[in-house]
Amino acid sequence: MIRISLDLMGGDFGPQVVIPGAAKALDRHPDISFVLYGLKEQCDPVLAKFPKLREKSIFHDCELAVAMDEKPSQALRRGRYISTMWRSIAAVKTGDADVAVSAGNTGALMAMAKFCLRTMANIERPAIAAIWPTLKGESIVLDVGATIGADAQQLMDFALMGGAMARALFEVERPTVGLLNVGVEEMKGQEEVKEAGRLLREANIDSLEYSGFVEGNDLGKGTVDVVVTEGFSGNIALKTAEGTAKQIGEYLRAAMSRTLLARIGYLFAKSAFDMLREKLDPSKVNGGVFLGLNGIVIKSHGGANAEGIAAAIEVGYDMAKNGLNQKIENDLKKYHAKRLPPMGPEAA
């Protein structure tokens, strides 16, 4: 049984969307049980519509919910110990849940997760990993917003964590990893990126295969299983991809409704357009994973619909079931053990 703690008040729509999303996830994975955190008056009427979910859940009434526009520092001061967001994270720390899921304020969620769970040994800063649709299927991109301006060692740590996530999610034995850069040549790019490339080449890590530098146009190609970058460029890439998907969707809608002939043509090509719409639907790949913490936290898009919430829950389910944090800890331990100077008689 995978136990998931869920912040019912997170996101733009709160329990009206989060609860139906949880019900969808439960239908697909009957071995999930939920620990729900919400405001009773708002949640009870919605929960009553989903008796199966209510039966597989424990509900905790909380004092407050973190606002979507609340500053992280304010949310931490005001909501520590008593908010739906904090308590959903704390359930992972106490062992009452295997993973926490929230569609709430990203900055507040990261601040609370870092404060409550703390970072793993040898991890200076956590990262947010996004699942990215590609021509070959899916890949992982990190960091997409947690760490702005990462140094070479932090990028190296991101590569290790991203590789562990790829093994947990895609079930590949040795995922390929690339560093996002302005070119594939070794002399190009910022010093931090070039140094991270050197570290990855020389580390000769058993759990991943370093494939060198990749460019922005490789993100959608699926050139590698994991793309590593720092949070500023990663977040811009993510938002650009989301905006481009919406733009293409709007272009198609406008083109297909412009004339009677276009509308007739759409009817003949409907299955192809439905397939494209499915590929461009952000809810299908919803769920950013906070990596590097002593516990698994999943961030859903704030504007996600019920299908998107279900997808984020399923990401958490997969991560917990496949032992994500154990894989990360093992990989970090092996890598940092190699970096330590020899001790005792061997050092002589």
UniProtKB/Swiss-Prot annotation:
GO terms for molecular function: phosphate:acyl-[acyl carrier protein] acyltransferase activity. The keyword Lipid biosynthesis applies. It holds the Pfam family FA_synthesis. It is found in: Cytoplasm. Its EC number is 2.3.1.274. Transmembrane segments: none annotated. It catalyses: a fatty acyl-[ACP] + phosphate = an acyl phosphate + holo-[ACP]. Disulfide bonds: none annotated. Pathway: Lipid metabolism; phospholipid metabolism. Keywords: Cytoplasm, Lipid biosynthesis, Lipid metabolism, Phospholipid biosynthesis, Phospholipid metabolism, Transferase. GO terms for cellular component: cytoplasm. One of its GO terms (biological process) is phospholipid biosynthetic process. Gene3D superfamilies: Isopropylmalate Dehydrogenase. Catalyzes the reversible formation of acyl-phosphate (acyl-PO(4)) from acyl-[acyl-carrier-protein] (acyl-ACP). This enzyme utilizes acyl-ACP as fatty acyl donor, but not acyl-CoA. PANTHER family: FATTY ACID/PHOSPHOLIPID SYNTHESIS PROTEIN PLSX (PTHR30100), PHOSPHATE ACYLTRANSFERASE (PTHR30100:SF1). Homodimer. Probably interacts with PlsY. This is Phosphate acyltransferase. It comes from Rhizobium johnstonii (strain DSM 114642 / LMG 32736 / 3841). The lineage of its organism: Bacteria, Pseudomonadati, Pseudomonadota, Alphaproteobacteria, Hyphomicrobiales.
